[in-house]
Structures are given as structure tokens and as C-alpha cells.
A protein has these predicted regions:
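Active-site/ligand-binding-proximal alpha/beta "capping" segment
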Residues: 89-124, 131, 182-189
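Flexible, glycine/proline-enriched loop segments at strand-loop-helix junctions
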Residues: 104-105, 129-133, 160-163
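A cross-family phosphate/adenosyl-ligand binding-site feature
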Residues: 1-97, 135-170, 174, 180-193
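Glycine-rich phosphate/nucleotide-binding loop
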Residues: 104, 125-128, 136-141
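Alpha-helix capping at helix-to-loop junctions
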Residues: 110, 120-126, 148-151, 155, ...
């Protein structure tokens, strides 16, 4: 794994543990020689992930829509900053530039990114690992929901296993490195989207 897309919130949460953890994620990836691909922002968890990686000498590739650059929320310290026109182009770039995906706490945009990475793997658009870091139980409800989808038959058990879940970053990264691809429903390329 050379680079991982990190999905996370751009907001500053009320509990500083989330910012501290985001900085830790960035720093740990840099120390492992893994580049960060992320939303290109300087605020919230996004900024903390980038800062942690940059402070540890890591590669940070931001992908941000023009509208957010114009709103002056872009992180100017990125190793590379890719400016795109649409959110779809942004998410496609995350897939194209990374070898896998890690979701840490965030809001609806983060959920959109996670669901897309998971559903694209399910459909065979990519075969990259999809990880969920459950910081202080933040995603307990989401995990229960995913399990419920599998229980009632809306998610095949083999596709439930696409989502690798852990509350410790190092063990999540180790599991992602040993990732075995689930059999997709279809076999497609991302150019067929």
C-alpha cells in the first residue's frame, strides 16, 4: 500500500479526541511510508490528518473542488493539491490516486465517500481495501446498521466483509495490507461509471 484515501470530517468536533486521533492517523501513515490522499481542506479532521502527516515528513495529496478553494478552505501545505470541478471528480480521484480507503469520524460527506467506496468494491469497480476506524465507538451505530443490512439480506455476507473495522489504527492497517478481494456482483472498471 503506497497511498490511502482518508475520509473524514471538515468540521471541528466538540471533543478534541477526534482531532488528536486524526493527527495521529496522518502521523502514523507517514511513519509507515504511506501517503495520504484526502479532501484537501485545512479545517477540522481533514486539516489535522494533513498536518500530522506533513509534520512527520509524509506525502499529502489533496483533492478539492474549485468552489472550496475559492472559499479559502484549501490546505496550502499539501505535497500536491488537485483542483477539480465536481464532487464526483473528487471521489473518482480518491479512487484513482489511492490503494485503499480509511474512514475516520465525519459527517454526511464522509458517509457518502465510505458508501461509494464500499458499493464500488461490491460492484467490482475496484478491489481495494475499505477500512473503518471506530474511534471511541463513534461508528457503533453504523456498524450495527451494516450488520442489519446483511442480516435481512440487503448486503451479501461476503460483501459485508468488504468493510474492515477496527478501533486500533495499526491493526486496521495490517488487516488492510492482507486484504482479500470479495467476489463482486459484477466485474467492471471505474471508467464504466
Amino acid at each position: 500500500v503506497k497511498r490511502l484515501a482518508i475520509y473524514c470530517g471538515s468540521a471541528t468536533p466538540s471533543d478534541p479526541v477526534y482531532i488528536e486521533n486524526a493527527r495521529f492517523v496522518g502521523r502514523t501513515l507517514a511513519e509507515r511510508g504511506i501517503g495520504v490522499v484526502y479532501g484537501g481542506g485545512r479545517l477540522g479532521l481533514m486539516g489535522a490528518v494533513a498536518d500530522g502527516a506533513l509534520e512527520a515528513g509524509g506525502e499529502v495529496i489533496g483533492v478539492i473542488p474549485t468552489a472550496l478553494v475559492n472559499a479559502e478552505v484549501a490546505h496550502r501545505g499539501c505535497t500536491e493539491l488537485h483542483v477539480v470541478e465536481t464532487m464526483h471528480q473528487r471521489k473518482q480521484a480518491f479512487t484513482d490516486l489511492s490503494d485503499g480507503f480509511v474512514t475516520i469520524p465525519g459527517g454526511t460527506g464522509t458517509m457518502d465517500e465510505l458508501w461509494e467506496a464500499m458499493s464500488w468494491a461490491q460492484l467490482g469497480y475496484h478491489s481495494k481495501p475499505v477500512g473503518l476506524l471506530n474511534v471511541t465507538g463513534y461508528y457503533d451505530g453504523l456498524i450495527a446498521f451494516v450488520d442489519k443490512m446483511a442480516e435481512v439480506g440487503f448486503l451479501r455476507p461476503m460483501h459485508r466483509d468488504i468493510l474492515l473495522i477496527d478501533d486500533q489504527l495499526d491493526s486496521l492497517l495490517d488487516r488492510m495490507a492482507g486484504h482479500k478481494v470479495a467476489r463482486p456482483i459484477f466485474s467492471m472498471s471505474s471508467s464504466e461509471l
